[in-house]
Design a protein with these regions (language model features):
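Active-site acidic-Proline motif in GNAT/NAT acetyltransferases
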Residues: 100-102, 106, 135
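Conserved acetyl-CoA-binding loop-helix of GNAT-fold acetyltransferases
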Residues: 105-118, 145
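Conserved beta-strand-loop-alpha-helix junction that forms the acyl-donor binding cleft
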Residues: 130-139, 157, 161
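Conserved GNAT acetyl-CoA-binding A-motif
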Residues: 120-132
Length: 166
């Protein structure tokens, strides 16, 4: 989960209703802007690619939801069912979740995650997983509050910037 520094009026998310729905092509520009506020990098090609991959194909196993308040995107989540990777039976994965910082603590991220979990259950899986940086306490706290805990798998990595570096 990432947070933005700004992004419009929080009034709409706090006082109006927030609707969780599948992403539409018209939402992508707002998602790009929201992500750029959170990360400091505009990644238009990346987000259009994510829309085409998760918002238009195999919608039974791929999910891209947005949280909308008064026609403004205040959050998003992307996930899918992955089959037999790393020798594991099919399970759901959360790839991205983001909520405007002024909409935190209003239940938006929880509602997005629950919408994804509902889709994953309907697709027949019984577990959901994600990856996050071990020192990202905000994200860790959110996922722990949602009942997620350390899994029995670990991530290994190798730095490819220099030959032989780890």
């Amino acid at each position: 989960m990432k947070a933005s520094a700004s992004g419009g009026s929080a009034k709409s998310a706090h006082q109006g209703s927030v609707n969780i729905r599948r992403v539409a092509a018209a939402d992508v520009a707002q998602i790009i802007a929201l992500d750029a506020e959170m990360t400091g990098v505009e990644k238009a090609d990346y987000w259009y690619s994510r829309f085409h991959e998760f918002g238009t194909r195999d919608l039974r196993n791929r999910f891209f939801f947005v949280a909308e308040a008064d026609r403004h995107i205040v959050g998003y989540i992307i996930g899918e069912v992955r089959d037999w990777e790393f020798g594991q039976p099919p399970c759901g994965w959360v790839f991205a979740i983001g909520v405007r910082s002024d909409c935190r603590l209003t239940g938006v991220a929880s509602r997005l995650l629950e919408a994804l979990c509902d889709g994953l259950r309907a697709a027949g899986v019984t577990k959901v997983r994600t990856l996050l940086a071990f020192d990202d306490l905000l994200v860790m706290s959110f996922y722990r509050s949602q009942g997620m805990m350390a899994a029995r798998m670990i991530t290994l990595e190798r730095n490819l910037d220099t030959e032989g570096a780890t």
